[in-house]
Amino acid sequence: MTLRCRCASVACLLIAIPAALASQRPAGAVRQEREQAAREVPKLAETLALEPGMIVADVGAGGGAVSVVMAKWLGPEGRVYATDIGAAQLAEIRAAVAQDALSNVVVLEGGESSTNLPNECCDAIFLRDVYHHLTRPGEFDASLLAALKPGGRVAIMDFPPDPGSSIPAGVPADRGGHGIPASIVVTEFTRAGFRHVTTMSRWPPEDDRSRLFLVMFEKP
């Protein structure tokens, strides 16, 4: 086989990898996540006072559905940092981004105690169903503060613990179960130097079935 043929074969393989990874999850589940993200992102953008062209981080991006929809909302001049932990999660996010041929999403591996985001890179950051898993929240909150521009906002979307549920391994015991009270989120973020802006008891507000709350903070 000639070098040109080998290079062409490798290129075809690299193109096929994202599609193969995307196909590992049920198409219905992926579609449902995209539809939910399409409903939620405009409301999140309004809550965070976002504008097209801004730079936003989706910390703990999961399958990448919200990152993809947010990147489209922000437009080609905007940017989304999509972060998560672990090769499988990062590959799934890259597959979602490649499927929509987006050039304004930066996929970044996060850490247990740090976002690994550049200093003062973001106008806003959000974490959905993520914060209650953190084992070193104080260090992580300091990392979030460092990643925001002055006046930037962070939104935490999470759920209160069920009484009697088990606390994930390594997570602080004051959570009271699997989940986290909104009051603890407020305490920890204000301790880290954030200003508390608002707490919404349900997120999204119009979804009566949702157990999520939203707490928003601003970097002074």
Predicted segment positions?
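Class I SAM-dependent transferase core
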Residues: 20-57, 62-66, 95
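Short glycine-dipeptide loop
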Residues: 52, 76-77, 148-154
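Hydrophobic beta-strand segment of the Class I
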Residues: 56, 125-126
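Class I SAM-dependent methyltransferase SAM/SAH-binding core
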Residues: 57-115
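A short glycine-rich, Lys/Arg-flanked "PGG" loop and its adjoining helix->strand segment in the class I
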Residues: 71, 138-153
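A short acidic, Gly/Pro-enriched loop at the edge of an enzyme's catalytic core
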Residues: 115-125
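Conserved class I S-adenosyl-L-methionine
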Residues: 153-186
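Core SAM-dependent methyltransferase catalytic element
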Residues: 198-220
